[in-house]
Amino acid sequence: MWLALLQGIRLAFWPLYAGWIALSLYLAVYLPIFISMARSLHRSWHVPLPMAAATAWVGCELIRAYFVTGFAACMLAHSQIPWPWMLPVASYFGSYGISFMVMFMGAVLCQWIRWGISKRSDKSNARSNKFIVANTLHTLFAVIAVCISIWSLHSNDSWLESQAPIKPLGTILLIQEDMPTQFDGSPEDMILGWQRYEQLTAFAADINASKQIDLVVWPESTFSAGVPWFDSENTPTPADLELMAVTESDMQMWLSQLEVKLNRIQSAFPNKATRYLLGTDTVKLRPGKVGKLNTALWFDPENRAMCGYYAKQHLVMFGEYIPLASSFPALLRLIGMGTMEAGEKPVAWQLASGATLSTSICFEDVLPHLIQSHVSKLTAMGKSPDMLVNITNDGWFRGSSILDHHLNNAILAAVENRRPMLVAANLGISAWIDGNGRVVRSLPRMQAGWILAEPIPDGRWGLWQSIGDWPARFLALFSCLPFVFALFRRFVVRA
């Protein structure tokens, strides 16, 4: 199953065939672990089967969301994306809450089916009556939970209708091109890709000339075209430049090219109130050290001193870094891969309209706890984001199902944090998602286009925003306790 779900990984780069198989085998291990956990809770601790199954499943999902670098795509909750009446659960307990309810209801249904098949051969009426009472209570719990979720969804719709018209947070232009991405792409290919993005941006600006565009968003790594942004505390010294294997004239040429590119994009929008969020590589220069970052560059023409960037915090293993890579530099050169540094903190920016946004890059929105952490930290700093923006370059995956998995995570991130989510994706799927998880507008995969999004504020509070995944952590701990006690009895008590 996992090989089929994740087959798009292999399309990015030939060494990732091994990564695709390894990741699939790793994820497959969780099924027998889940069965063992649920069985132990049910038989050893006498936890009712629906509760045992749901607890064990959520425990496994939480563990794989954190273990090593974390992988929280293709969760059971994502199967409910087509049915928005289940999604409000995520605003209280995250995607783990939806997974819990789906597994709980599935186990209740299996219990009824098993009872229906076996009741003819079961001569114990007392046992049968006890089962009926217990499973009826479980069914009632599931029905009440679903009704509350549906009520939450419809009550918010009613509130929005009563408040209409609601002033949008801003007018945001999301750009999507159909440029495939490859590790061994030539400089000419990168320049061509940049030119296509520039032309599409200018065309979209011309079509929407009557609109005041507050923000233009380019996907991950599409602005670089082989020329990175530079972050230097002071003027780079010759020693610093030597670490980069470049000369001072090279540096001046790159800086000049960056200035030209920014001016060319800005020329399509004569109003200086327009801001720009551009996916680019950044070279971070520090005395005696050079680091490469995957960043979202913020460009404010009215105040260039406020230009800055958000550096991706959660790097993709084998794509952006390789464990212990510094010990094998020759291997990195052989397969044509480098390694990046991780960012340190979330960043918030403000539009001319006054709205604040927070950015994530690539598969960062696959980790529910990371986005929740961004929102929580920024709120504590007095910079609570009104909307979330994800920039990603999914051109690696050639239109495969990986794009659908990625969009599903963005949808749940919007619901969990009760904020609209905007996705700008190279090759797709770019989308405008509201705080209920509804896709207001999206672009087809592998097609060029743009979305003119006007997201509305969603000021609702959700339990997830305050406590994050602590309920899921408790379930994970509880599901592991039978193993802990079994090991304790085996090795400690016997000794």
Give the positions of each predicted feature.
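Soluble catalytic regions of membrane-associated enzymes that act on cell-envelope
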Residues: W151-V316, L351-S353, T359, F363, ...
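Active-site catalytic pocket residues across diverse enzymes, especially alpha/beta-hydrolases
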Residues: L41, I113-G116, W218, H374-L378
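Active-site catalytic loop in hydrolytic enzyme cores
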Residues: I9-A18, F67-S91, K289-P368, Q372-S373
